[in-house]
């Protein structure tokens, strides 16, 4: 399973749709995610693990009640063995609510083919 697959599997029971990077659909409530990868557990000139600095972005209409969903997202992420408890940053602006859940993921995942040579 790739890290993308694991994030989607974790977030989608709470919010759908959930996609990497950019959502271009019609839903007014959705999640996107992105992450940076760092070598972890380095020894014998090799990285034995990867630490991903993950951001899950939850978007909703300005007047929507989102507290229960934000807490459900936090709890779902925290329940994954190799994910840390996320912080939640409010990035809301005049176009809608936007919450960023930031956490670390440490492990070994299958490689994701990004389609670039």
Regions found by a protein language model. Give the residues of each.
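Long, contiguous binding/interaction regions
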Residues: 1-53, 59-117
């Amino acid at each position: 399973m790739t890290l993308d697959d694991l994030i989607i599997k974790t977030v989608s029971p709470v919010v759908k749709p959930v996609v990497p990077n950019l959502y271009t659909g019609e839903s007014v409530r959705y999640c996107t995610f992105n992450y940076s990868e760092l070598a972890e557990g380095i020894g014998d000139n090799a990285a034995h693990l990867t630490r991903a600095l993950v951001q899950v972005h939850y978007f909703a209409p300005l007047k929507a009640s989102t507290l229960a969903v934000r807490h459900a997202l936090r709890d779902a992420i925290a329940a994954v063995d190799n994910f840390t408890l996320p912080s939640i940053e409010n990035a809301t602006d005049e176009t809608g609510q936007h919450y960023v859940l930031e956490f670390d993921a440490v492990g070994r995942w299958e490689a994701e083919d990004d389609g670039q040579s």
